[in-house]
């Protein structure tokens, strides 16, 4: 069973997490930012990942450290759980309609961090989450997971739906990319011979 546990403590945040890739979508999330909790909960559920995630950050200063560091720790969890990445599909994508909103996410776990993120969110807050920080969350994730991630809302009206559609797409794309391809067995999905 591919799994990982990470504890990351800085002067700004203390974040611990446990991830099981072949899970059942179970979660225990507490970041101190309820809308971020909601996004991580639906990420676990739609990805079929078991995720425990506890964050204690300097929210009295700002949400930035907590949100960015949450992305860092999630990326570290995936990097550790994936190990040498032999036999994985490596890349995945998903397109999701959520009521009036349509979003797409594509991911490549090939070890080359890059992020293109376009959410079309036009407000400062969705729930209690500072929306500009979602980009920082994904930036932290891609660097520490060794992932190339493209996320885009094609259209939509509700800012809540836009973010939720992105996280659901992210979950489904990661689910496929992390999945094992029985034909590859212990081979790396790369002509270079390394990721």
Curated annotation (Swiss-Prot):
Localization: Cytoplasm
Species of origin: Solibacter usitatus (strain Ellin6076)
Gene3D superfamilies: Imidazole glycerol phosphate dehydratase, domain 1
UniProt superkingdom: Bacteria
Gene Ontology molecular function: imidazoleglycerol-phosphate dehydratase activity
EC numbers on record: 4.2.1.19
Pathway noted in the entry: Amino-acid biosynthesis; L-histidine biosynthesis; L-histidine from 5-phospho-alpha-D-ribose 1-diphosphate: step 6/9
Reactions listed under catalytic activity: D-erythro-1-(imidazol-4-yl)glycerol 3-phosphate = 3-(imidazol-4-yl)-2-oxopropyl phosphate + H2O
GO biological process terms held by the UniProt record: L-histidine biosynthetic process
Protein's gene: hisB
Stored CDD domains: IGPD
Protein name: Imidazoleglycerol-phosphate dehydratase
Disulfide bonds: none
Pfam families: IGPD (PF00475)
Coiled-coil parts of chain: none
GO cellular component, as recorded: cytoplasm
Principal place of residence: cytoplasm
Family: Belongs to the imidazoleglycerol-phosphate dehydratase family.
Family annotation (InterPro entries): IGPD_sf (IPR038494), ImidazoleglycerolP_deHydtase (IPR000807), ImidazoleglycerP_deHydtase_CS (IPR020565), Ribosomal_Su5_D2-typ_SF (IPR020568)
